[in-house]
């Protein structure tokens, strides 16, 4: 997602793009908040996202996939790429409002495209503002095409026991974690060839951002949900954010998806959180309808743009939560 209001024009700026360094993080975080807050018209733009954090968490997860743009030694923007196996997406791509429409965003997209090629990405994408033809026009120049809307949804957390058989990654003995990650990889690979959430599971565990909910039927893993919880994460105070969640496709998909949402809600209630937040692409029609029926309501919606212009895992019959922000 990129908060700019106009198509970028050719620029005579001397823009230097380089790896984002740890010493840049405070400035990059400020620019991210200021850019989004300005674009959506907040009275205090720098307060965008409150105590949630995207910049530091993503840099720590993979510093080699974070890029900085500077002009005359001044940091003016940043971009982050994320690798989920054969799936890749980028963002937040943010630029200081003083430098909008001057070619900075174009320069920040170039190293991301190179990374996707190095990674062997077969499906790449982004989430952006659905109402902005300017954003669509810019990204189309790089081969990304708009598809279905993604709804960012939330509901109050209800503290009730459902009898669902679930555990968390943090509860697993260290000796068992590699096998669990392999089982998660096998599950996601069954949804889209090469889809792999290992990096997200490990980032949440190492940075203590929340936990990964594991859904079981006996000894078979049937669902996973990578969750951020509370301040200093991508969730923010009082919130459990399901960054990724999925169950195996098939006849039991609907029932398993309901059980996975039960597990997420119970885990969040155990942490005394009050709000469950999750995104779903509306091309996953059954999952979207099921979340609405459960009481989720859309807070924000945007559009997914994909390269190549294919469905990937955004298709009917797939019970999966994510939003590519």
Please report, for each region that a protein language model flagged, where it lies by residue.
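Conserved acetyl-CoA binding element of GNAT-fold acetyltransferases
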Residues: 86-98, 235-251
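Conserved beta-strand in the GNAT
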Residues: 66-68, 74-82, 89-94, 214, ...
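Conserved N-terminal entry element of GNAT/NAT acetyltransferase domains
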Residues: 1-23, 156-176
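Conserved acetyl-CoA-binding loop-helix of GNAT-fold acetyltransferases
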Residues: 92-95, 101-115, 123, 137-141, ...
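Conserved catalytic-core motifs of GNAT/GCN5-like acyltransferases
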Residues: 125-128, 145-158, 297-310
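Amide-forming acyltransferase catalytic core, primarily the GNAT-like/NAT-type
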Residues: 141-241
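Conserved GNAT acetyl-CoA-binding A-motif
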Residues: 90, 116-131, 269-281
């Amino acid at each position: 997602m990129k908060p700019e209001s106009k198509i970028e024009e050719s620029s005579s700026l001397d823009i230097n793009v380089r790896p984002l360094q740890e010493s840049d993080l405070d400035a990059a975080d400020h620019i991210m908040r200021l850019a989004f807050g300005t674009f959506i018209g907040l009275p205090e733009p720098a307060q965008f996202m409150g105590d949630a954090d995207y910049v530091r968490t993503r840099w720590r997860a993979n510093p080699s996939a974070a890029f900085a743009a500077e002009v005359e030694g001044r940091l003016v923007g940043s971009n982050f790429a994320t690798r989920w196996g054969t799936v890749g997406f980028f963002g937040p791509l943010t630029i200081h409002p003083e430098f909008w429409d001057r070619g900075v965003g174009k320069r920040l997209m170039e190293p991301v495209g190179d990374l996707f090629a190095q990674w062997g990405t077969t499906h790449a994408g982004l989430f952006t503002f659905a109402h902005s033809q300017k954003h669509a026009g810019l990204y189309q120049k790089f081969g990304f095409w708009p598809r279905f809307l993604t709804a960012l949804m939330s509901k109050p957390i209800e503290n009730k026991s459902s009898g669902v058989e679930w555990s968390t990654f943090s509860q697993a003995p260290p000796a068992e974690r590699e096998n669990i990650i392999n089982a998660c990889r096998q599950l996601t690979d069954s949804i889209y060839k090469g889809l792999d959430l290992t990096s997200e599971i490990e980032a949440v565990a190492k940075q203590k951002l929340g936990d990964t909910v594991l859904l079981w039927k006996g000894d078979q893993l049937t669902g996973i949900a990578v969750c951020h919880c509370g301040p200093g994460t991508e969730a923010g105070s009082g919130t459990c954010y399901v960054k990724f969640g999925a169950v195996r496709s098939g006849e039991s998909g609907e029932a398993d998806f309901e059980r996975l949402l039960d597990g997420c809600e119970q885990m969040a209630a155990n942490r005394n959180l009050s709000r469950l937040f999750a995104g779903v692409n509306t091309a996953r029609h059954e999952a979207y309808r099921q979340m609405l029926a459960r009481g989720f309501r859309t807070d924000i919606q945007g559009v997914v743009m994909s390269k190549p212009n294919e469905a990937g895992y955004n298709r009917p019959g797939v019970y999966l939560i994510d939003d590519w922000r």
